[in-house]
């Protein structure tokens, strides 16, 4: 029925493309007229568009003419004409949608269309890439077109001087990575001077590789942190504990005897759990190494931190492995991006995990950090007035884009039909059999002159395969995080006849593999050679292309680029990205995945079913199973994982939305403080409110005089705010004084003392001092609030045991924490300003300089893993325990939460 309806009225995608094609026809009709313009007339079009837009013409109405101008500029600057399908993609991007275009269809050039159109508004357009290399490359490459049309471009990269960053954001078009845009937003909300802020209002962003940034990295927030207290010795001593504990052969099953051992590992949830025997063993070991006093229990509230450190050490030993999740370089543990295989230099895991891995590897342990500011990409990118994205693989995640970002995915047709052959997976019983089949396939391609790209899921696997190829005497190149610097060079050679390239996940590589090899670098070198005349350059380039042509034909005859996958990834999208490297622009190509029942995805999610099929077929050793049914079975397993990951991201967003609402309120108030000419009226309001609250603590409203604690109020005013006021004497002299009149006198006294301070220092200097104190107080209490939210988040799932909704409880308690924080900011600001003794304007300036100095010390930037514990409401986790003070509970006693379970099977499991 659904398919019949689609045939009759077309799918939503078909209807959108039909609408867009009308606009493309309009753009094409303008081409002769625009082509007739001189370079100067084409440049003048930009100012004409700006004037028309200011006079009320919408960007939508300017689209046909603006796109036609960009197409003409592309022809004149690059000698490249935007295809009609690129126009379709450009219209989709302008309309705030995700354009899915196959690899090699020209996404970078397509983006120039909506970027130019939206830059006409003069509010700044951000083009977001996955790494600094692509940001610089695209800014330089596409910048030539924008400059030709009178638009300015900038690029933001890490460690860039602040004045350069400010200039880059002031440009019409700004290129940069998702991390840098996010960090700059956080930095702007930590600045103490308006002129030091970098970003303008977030107007329009185009996100390249949108699936990688908005989905793969959505669980990992950007964090700016500073150093916390030192636990170095504890990490080193705790590192000796995991090897002394015994791992269970399997996870305990209900109603079955518990397997022998101290702990089990849940690879699905990436957590480690202790058995009852394990807790006893751990206590004995910790006592023996001097970490736990004799006769005391790990369950004592004062040893909860010890428990946390032990569980972190166990995770470091059982779930995090060298050359898979991280590498060791220059005496440092460097995280490897699970999705792209890139080294994530400078990023650190949170909750002490990074320090535990450093202790395991015997490298220098760096200090733990306190979060200063944090935001997820989900919440950062949703702040843009308009957001769009482009990728080669978005359709599998279209539902998530729509659900979380309200971004619709439009599948753009290819310029030429795709002829790549995607063969069924081959599944072997063992890894050894799988690698033998891969070697045979690679050898066959190499002998026939067909280039091969082999995709692996980890650095370890890529180096294992490289070792096998060396033994087989097959020449090859390895492209992984360790070869990052040579990446573009390796990719340029990957399409040459018989070339073998091994690569970790190719997501976000950003460089096309051209059949016969790429000559772009040599062409660029010829263009840059000033010793050659233009005519000589043209001759050399023609010769170069003539030499490349037979190589290109030879590779096409051999079957184009061969893609070999050594494992299925959790996400079908990552597999599709690997396949998408072949078959660009109508080129031939083929792909196949080789799997074994020992692969992680197969073992955890699909192994039993496929193994049963293999046993029924009684396949001999080395013989694979290859059938559409098996491929579908694997894709079903991948869908399950994708569904679970989507649920986790959605849960995370629901929790983070609470923090995000608070962040927006606080940052808005902070910006008001920063931008206001004077905050004197604000401070006065805070002071009067603080005085009234203190006053009512001793003299409640509508109370009789016998209930008043006047002596206590006098003491509090003198101790907290240095207000010496003889309230007792006043009441004796004027017995008819009401509480309201008494409050007015206290408020007036506070105002008088404050006015004297202002007059002594000077109104201008004091106003600056007020601002500085207010900003410091906001920042300090916000940091503490972020830590409090973190602790709350880690333990909130326990409320599920008490038949409460953890999300509702989190919202309620987070609101209470936020209200309490605002009160503490108020009290802190009033206390400092009332008690500080300032004699001159010079002292004020020195205090501000000291604050600014403290403000920038030991700041680090992370994109660390969010703890998944909060995403699985009510499910037991091995996360950091809740820090509260509880009476000691025996493991076999009933749990104090009231669930009726034994403590060891309930909250004891989470300790």
Swiss-Prot record:
Record localization: Cell inner membrane; Cytoplasm
UniProt GO BP: intracellular protein transmembrane transport; protein import; protein targeting; protein transport by the Sec complex
Gene Ontology molecular functions: ATP binding; metal ion binding; protein-exporting ATPase activity
Pfam families to which the protein is assigned, alphabetical: P-loop_SecA, SEC-C, SecA_DEAD, SecA_PP_bind, SecA_SW
Region Disordered, annotated ranges: 869-888
PROSITE patterns: SECA, SECA_MOTOR_DEAD
Listed EC numbers: 7.4.2.8
UniProt keyword terms in alphabetical order: ATP-binding, Cell inner membrane, Cell membrane, Cytoplasm, Membrane, Metal-binding, Nucleotide-binding, Protein transport, Translocase, Translocation, Transport, Zinc
Cofactor: binding comment: May bind 1 zinc ion per subunit.
Chain segments annotated as coiled-coil in the UniProt record: none
InterPro entries cross-referenced by the UniProt entry: Helicase_ATP-bd, Helicase_C-like, P-loop_NTPase, SEC_C_motif, SecA, SecA_CS, SecA_DEAD, SecA_motor_DEAD
Positions of ATP binding: 86, 104-108, 512
Protein origin, superkingdom: Bacteria
Cofactor: Zn(2+)
Membrane topology (UniProt): Peripheral membrane protein
Metal-binding found in the keyword field: yes
Annotated residues for binding of Zn(2+): 895, 897, 906-907
Catalysed reaction, written as an equation: ATP + H2O + cellular proteinSide 1 = ADP + phosphate + cellular proteinSide 2
Assembly: Monomer and homodimer. Part of the essential Sec protein translocation apparatus which comprises SecA, SecYEG and auxiliary proteins SecDF-YajC and YidC.
Record's function text: Part of the Sec protein translocase complex. Interacts with the SecYEG preprotein conducting channel. Has a central role in coupling the hydrolysis of ATP to the transfer of proteins into and across the cell membrane, serving both as a receptor for the preprotein-SecB complex and as an ATP-driven molecular motor driving the stepwise translocation of polypeptide chains across the membrane.
Family: Belongs to the SecA family.
Record-given protein name: Protein translocase subunit SecA
Gene: secA
């Amino acid at each position: 029925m659904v398919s019949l309806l689609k045939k009759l009225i077309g799918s939503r995608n078909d209807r959108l493309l039909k609408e867009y094609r009308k606009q493309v026809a309009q753009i094409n009709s303008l081409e002769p007229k625009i082509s007739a313009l001189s370079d100067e007339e084409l440049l003048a079009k930009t100012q004409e568009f700006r004037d028309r837009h200011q006079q009320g013409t919408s960007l939508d109405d300017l689209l046909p003419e603006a796109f036609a101008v960009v197409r003409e500029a592309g022809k004149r600057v690059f000698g490249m004409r935007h295809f009609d399908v690129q126009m379709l993609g450009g219209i989709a991007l302008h309309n705030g949608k995700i354009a899915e275009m196959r690899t090699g269809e020209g996404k970078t050039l397509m983006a120039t269309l909506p970027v130019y159109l939206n830059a006409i508004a003069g509010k700044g357009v951000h083009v977001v890439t996955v790494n600094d290399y692509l940001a610089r490359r695209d800014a330089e490459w596409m910048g030539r077109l924008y400059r030709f049309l009178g638009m300015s471009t900038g690029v933001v990269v890490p460690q860039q001087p602040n004045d350069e960053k400010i200039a880059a954001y002031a440009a019409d078009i700004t290129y940069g990575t998702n991390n840098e845009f996010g960090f700059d937003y956080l930095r702007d909300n930590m600045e103490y001077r308006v002129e030091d802020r970098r970003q303008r209002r977030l107007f329009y962003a185009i996100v390249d590789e949108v699936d990688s940034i908005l989905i793969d990295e959505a669980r990992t927030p950007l964090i700016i942190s500073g150093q916390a207290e030192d636990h170095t010795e504890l990490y080193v001593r705790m590192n000796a504990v995991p090897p002394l504990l015994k791992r269970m052969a399997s996870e305990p099953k209900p109603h079955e005897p518990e397997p022998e051992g101290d702990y089990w590992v849940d690879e699905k949830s990436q957590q480690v759990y202790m058995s009852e025997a394990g807790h006893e063993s751990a206590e004995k070991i910790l006592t023996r190494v001097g970490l736990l006093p004799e006769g005391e229990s790990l369950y004592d509230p004062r040893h909860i931190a010890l428990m946390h450190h032990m569980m972190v050490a166990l995770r470091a030993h059982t779930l995090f492995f060298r050359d898979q999740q991280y590498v060791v370089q220059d005496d440092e543990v460097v995280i490897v991006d699970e999705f792209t295989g890139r080294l994530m230099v400078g990023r650190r895991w949170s909750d002490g995990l990074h320090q535990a891995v450093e202790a395991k590897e015997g490298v220098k342990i760096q200090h733990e950090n306190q979060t200063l500011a944090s935001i997820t990409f989900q919440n950062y990118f949703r702040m843009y007035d308009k957001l769009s994205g482009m990728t080669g693989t978005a359709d599998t995640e279209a539902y998530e884009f729509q659900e979380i970002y309200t971004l619709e995915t439009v599948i753009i047709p290819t310029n030429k039909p795709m002829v790549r052959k995607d063969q069924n997976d081959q599944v072997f019983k063992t890894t050894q059999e799988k690698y033998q089949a891969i070697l045979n396939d690679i050898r066959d391609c190499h002998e026939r002159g067909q280039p091969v790209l082999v995709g692996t899921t980890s650095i370890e696997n890529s180096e294992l395969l490289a070792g096998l190829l060396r033994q087989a005497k097959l020449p090859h190149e390895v492209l992984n995080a360790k070869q990052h610097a040579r990446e573009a060079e390796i990719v340029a050679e990957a399409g040459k006849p018989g070339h073998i390239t091994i690569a970790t996940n190719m997501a976000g590589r950003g460089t096309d593999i051209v059949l016969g090899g790429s000559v772009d670098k040599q062409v660029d070198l010829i263009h840059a050679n000033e010793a050659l005349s233009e005519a000589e350059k043209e001759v050399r380039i023609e010769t170069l292309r003539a030499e490349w042509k037979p190589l290109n034909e030879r590779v096409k005859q051999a079957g184009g680029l061969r893609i070999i996958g050594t494992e299925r990834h959790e996400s079908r999208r990552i597999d599709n990205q690997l396949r998408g490297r072949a078959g660009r622009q109508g080129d031939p190509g083929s792909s196949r995945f080789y799997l074994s029942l020992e692969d992680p995805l197969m073992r955890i999610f699909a192994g039993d079913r496929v193994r049963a099929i293999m046993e029924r077929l009684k396949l001999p050793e080395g013989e694979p199973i290859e059938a559409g049914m098996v491929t579908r079975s694997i894709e079903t397993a991948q869908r399950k994982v994708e569904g679970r990951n989507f649920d986790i991201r959605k849960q995370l967003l629901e929790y983070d939305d609470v923090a995000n609402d608070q962040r927006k309120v606080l940052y808005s108030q902070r910006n008001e403080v920063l931008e206001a000419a004077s905050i004197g009226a604000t401070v006065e309001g805070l002071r009067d409110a603080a005085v009234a609250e203190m006053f009512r603590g001793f003299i409640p409203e509508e109370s009789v005089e016998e209930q008043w604690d006047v002596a206590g109020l006098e003491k509090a005013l003198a101790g907290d705010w240095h207000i010496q006021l003889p309230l007792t004497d006043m009441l004796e002299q004027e017995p008819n004084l009401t509480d309201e009149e008494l409050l007015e006198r206290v408020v007036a006294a506070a105002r008088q003392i404050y006015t004297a301070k202002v007059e002594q220092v000077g109104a201008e200097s004091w106003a600056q001092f007020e601002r500085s104190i207010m900003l410091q107080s906001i920042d300090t209490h916000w940091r503490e609030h972020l830590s409090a939210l973190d602790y709350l988040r880690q333990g909130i799932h326990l409320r599920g045991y008490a038949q409460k909704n953890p999300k509702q409880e989190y919202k309620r308690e987070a609101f209470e924490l936020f209200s309490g924080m605002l009160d503490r900011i108020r009290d802190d600001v009033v206390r400092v300003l009332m008690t500080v003794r300032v004699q001159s304007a010079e002292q004020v300036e020195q205090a501000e300089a000291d604050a600014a100095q403290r403000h920038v010390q030991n700041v680090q930037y992370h994109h660390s893993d969010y703890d998944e514990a909060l995403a699985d409401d009510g499910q037991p986790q091995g996360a950091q325990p809740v820090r509260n003070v509880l009476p000691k509970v025996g493991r076999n006693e009933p749990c104090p939460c009231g669930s009726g379970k034994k403590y060891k099977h309930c909250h004891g499991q989470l300790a």
